[in-house]
């Protein structure tokens, strides 16, 4: 039986778009048929980078969506335009790969969710670490009961995000970035949900949030570049706090703590701790009842989430999973509906900052 091949439009021509293009080019069921972005020179450059000549090139999403043969749209634009992009693509009947964060407000998420539900299209959101080999291994072990019932999860996103990142000029702004947890810390929040869930392909839901924000970088024009090890003055400052710490109560009774820390003076790290009543995880080290007489930590020799470089992130696994979902008419465990809950937690924390009180979910 001949399997279908899906045409792909990649909307956005930045750093992460290149990783989407690579993944679609390697999947046997997809081919890039069009690229679009705000500037034509960026579109042309991306096409040249990946040897694509016979494709449509656009600066207008509406026109790009009309390009013949587009079945899937990858949204790789800045976060503050994701909502309008997703609504337009869903309205055109296209399946969607959506970069995180998906939106900048609960209102935008509701509108996106309504558009996707009405269109009946498939979606996946790029909480791409779910396909990291360590994450996959730990999730399998959790589902097998290697650590018993999970009662506490702790995850942290620690990255000195600053002007070395091309997206910082917009993401640092309160209006366009909103918060450290939304821009990038959401990876750690999604990880906490993923590991707190005992089922193989399901993340746990949160029922209550309490949060603090602080740190030192908000409004500060002095910044550190951990790639060069140098300090610089007169840099554009963050308009929101660089540190956020969440306390979470999960629906299944587990507790969690998640932080996003842009203010750290060190290389990128992504610490993971998972505690069960029959075992424990500390990053890639495990202690489990499966190993009677265990005298020391067992280290899993696999790829860890050790860099913010998107070239290190497992986009191929995400794209292959999503194409398989389309082929077999099933929903992704990381679809828009699921990812909306991760974002809902972030906006609940924003409410907590305003009131100083825990916030009960749902609020979406």
Where are these regions (language model features)?
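N-terminal Rossmann-like dinucleotide-binding module
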Residues: 1-51
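C-terminal helix-rich "cap/oligomerization" subdomain common to oxidoreductases
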Residues: 1-2, 30, 41, 72-74, ...
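Contiguous beta-strand/loop segments that form the cofactor/metal-binding neighborhood of enzyme cores
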Residues: 2, 190-289, 316-330
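Beta-loop-alpha module in the N-terminal Rossmann-like domain of NAD(P)-dependent dehydrogenases
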Residues: 55-115
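Hydrophobic residues in well-ordered beta-strands that form the structural core
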Residues: 98, 104, 123-125, 154, ...
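Rossmann-fold dehydrogenase core element
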Residues: 111-128, 148-155
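Predominantly a Rossmann-like dinucleotide-binding segment in NAD(P)-dependent oxidoreductases
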Residues: 129-237, 356
